[in-house]
Amino acid sequence: SGEFDFGFAYDGDADRIALLSKKYNFKGDILAIFFSKHMKNPTVIGEVKCSQVMYDTINSYGKAIMYKTGHSNLKVKIKETNADFAAEVSGHLFFNDRYFGYDDAIYATLRALELIDAGFDFDLEFEALPQVYSTPEINITVTEDTKFKIIEDLKVALQNPPSDFPKIKDIITVDGVRVIFEKGWGLVRASNTTPKLVTRFE
C-alpha cells in the first residue's frame, strides 16, 4: 500500500526470507531461479516441495538436485555436493558460491539488492516463467506410528495403479512420494516433527 518497490521480511532468527514486489510474493523456489540464473553453470539443491518449474528451469542452464525437506538436510547436502545454492519453498536460501553455504536472510537480502541494482526485474522474470497452479501445504492428521507405513503402502500401490489413474512419468522417493504426471505432480510425505502427512500438488 505504500510507495515502496520491494519488501523484505524475516522470521525470528533471520534464516528465512520473504521477498515482495508491488505485485508478487516470491517463494523460495522461485527465488532459487532468479539467483542461480546469475551463477555460472550452477548446481542447485531444492526440496521435494519445490515447483517443477524450478527444476526444469535450472536444468536448462545448470544442474538441479531434488532432496529431502528440512533446512538441516539441505545444509548437509550442500556440503556433501559443494553445490552453489540450495532453497526451500519456505524461504531458507543457502548461498555457497560467494558465501558460506548456510541460510542467512540478511545476506540473501544483499544478493537481491545486488540484482535490483543491476537492473534485474523480478516481476518480468517471474511473468516469463511457465504459469502453474500450486496448492499450499495440505496437512492430513494421522498417527505417529502409522505415518511412515502409509508412505510405504503408497509406494507399493503406485507400482500397479488403477487403469483410470493418470499416466505416471516418474516416481521420486527421496522424501515420501512425489509422483510426476504429464502436466503436474503430487507429493505425499510424512512430517518430520508432527503426526501428519504433508501433501502438495501442482
Predicted regions and their residues:
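Phosphate-binding and adjacent anionic-ligand microenvironments
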Residues: N41-R200
